[in-house]
């Protein structure tokens, strides 16, 4: 998940440097979304993870 977030962040930074506003905004939004989903999944797995028998 975090790898995808970093990839979208890099795409957003490159698009912003080249002046593609719409693409940069979309890639930044996707990076934020993937980051938040990754954090939520991490917290869920932290609390409901593997338990000892």
UniProtKB/Swiss-Prot annotation:
Listed Pfam families: DUF1328
Superkingdom of the organism of origin: Bacteria
Subcellular location(s) per record: Cell membrane
A single cellular component GO annotation: plasma membrane
Bilayer topology term: Multi-pass membrane protein
Transmembrane region(s): 4-24, 27-47
Keyword Transmembrane helix: yes
Principal subcellular localization: membrane
Keywords noted in UniProt: Cell membrane, Membrane, Transmembrane, Transmembrane helix
Protein family membership: Belongs to the UPF0391 family.
The protein, known as: UPF0391 membrane protein Ent638_0536
Source organism: Enterobacter sp. (strain 638)
């Amino acid at each position: 998940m975090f790898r995808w977030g970093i990839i979208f962040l890099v795409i957003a930074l490159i698009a912003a440097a080249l002046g593609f506003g719409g693409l940069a905004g979309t890639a930044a939004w996707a990076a934020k979304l993937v980051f938040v989903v990754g954090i939520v999944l991490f917290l869920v797995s932290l609390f409901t993870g593997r338990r000892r028998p």
